Amino acid sequence: MDTPKMGDLYQRIANQINEMIPSEWENVYLYAEILDDSSEVYFYFNIPGKNEFLYSHNIPEHFNVSEDIYDDLLIELQESFEELREEYEKNNPETWTNLTLKLDRTGQFSIDYNYEDVIASELNGSQRKAVWVYKNLGLMPKRKTVRDFLEDYIKTNEGKI
């Protein structure tokens, strides 16, 4: 169940994402993993007229943005997701561990919450990321070891991805 505070947090998160991207953009696909003792947030976005998706952590290099400014904005975004998780816990019997947020430039968004115990998962962080990127963007990893893993994973989990 969403609460008014969650609605405010969704708006704040959308604004923070917009502030982090130093250009016009079409779509954002964001992954947030918030656990009791750690958090990770990253996203991919595309620029109008281009099909290529850019990785959020490459913004400083790609757009010549200060790494310190980017890191500060990323920490603020992570804190917003931590606050969202706390608010969610107050109003729902089950706590999510990660989510996928899809946002377009008109402000339309969707959030898919996932309750999987990522600590107990057989996949490590880079493998989870590879699966998520493939599921949401259809992109294969560049690094051979991760690409080989994903190809095997796709074969093994055919129809589940």
From Swiss-Prot:
Q: Does the keyword Cytoplasm apply?
A: yes
* Keywords per UniProt: Cytoplasm
An annotated GO cellular component of this protein is: cytoplasm
For the keyword Phosphoprotein, the answer is: no
Q: What does this protein do?
A: Immunity component of an LXG toxin-immunity module. These modules promote kin selection, mediate competition in biofilms, and drive spatial segregation of different strains, indicating that LXG toxins may help avoid warfare between strains in biofilms. Neutralizes the toxic abilities of cognate toxin YeeF upon expression in E.coli and in vitro.
Query: What is the annotated quaternary arrangement, including any partners?
Result: Monomer. Interacts with the C-terminus of cognate toxin YeeF, probably with 2:2 stoichiometry. The second YezG molecules binds with lower affinity.
Provide the protein name.
Immunity protein YezG
Q: Provide the species name.
A: Bacillus spizizenii (strain ATCC 23059 / NRRL B-14472 / W23)
Could you tell me the gene encoding this protein?
yezG
